[in-house]
Amino acid sequence: MLILLSPAKTMTGTSKIKAPQGTTPRFQQEANEIALHMTQFPIDELSRILKLSPKLAAECYRRYQDFHAEDKQPLQAILAYTGVVFKNISPKDFTEEDFLFSQEHMRFVSGCYGLLRPLDLIKPYRMEFDVKIPELGDGNMYAFWKDRQTNTLIHDVRQGDRILLNLASLDIQPSFQWKEVERSVRIITPEFKIWKNGKAETIVIYAKMCRGQMSRYLIKNRISDPEALKAFTWEGFSYKESMSEGDNWVFLQE
């Protein structure tokens, strides 16, 4: 079973957490090219295309200017991302075996690096899939990655039991030939809902927390049977058979 996760917007370039030796991203050449073209954008343009405050745009500008600097060391992706999902994966207590298990059973979808493994070494960046870089063609980053990474994802899922645990947000799907992925492997998509105002609602922050916690649960317990995921509970969230349909599994907090 392979976990698919969205990247985080917040990142760091340093960590005190000890992890196994990093690996080279499989689309490193593409990432280098993207980052090189991003250096041409001034701060105000980065603010516009990435929808950033002036302060964050300035930070983004510095990061792209430093992207190819040899004195700026990359960091394993699972440590570099610091958003809500990754805080809840909480790799600070991972053993070497946990990291290695995650390397085989987890993938992140990056607008700059493409499909990433947890130990792939990356540098901080900021990217949105709707960004257009003229030198890379007429389309945006969705178009850039769609054909490049689809077969890589399918191959990675088929290396195991042909089951993809889709814990990514909907907005990453257009970066793949998603219909082809659906035809090629089984996709299980958990949904995390809260009972509010007489109905089940998705609250984004809680959904992100649960995605991270479920990923951690799978890694720490070495889960390979998807049925075992139905035993996942966290902060009152639990699997609801009556609300689930097919491979769309609902976990409800009542």
From Swiss-Prot:
Coiled coil: none annotated. One of its GO terms (cellular component) is cytosol. Pfam families: H2O2_YaaD. HAMAP family: UPF0246. Belongs to the UPF0246 family. It comes from the Bacteria. This is UPF0246 protein BDI_1226. One of its GO terms (biological process) is response to hydroperoxide. InterPro entries: YaaA.
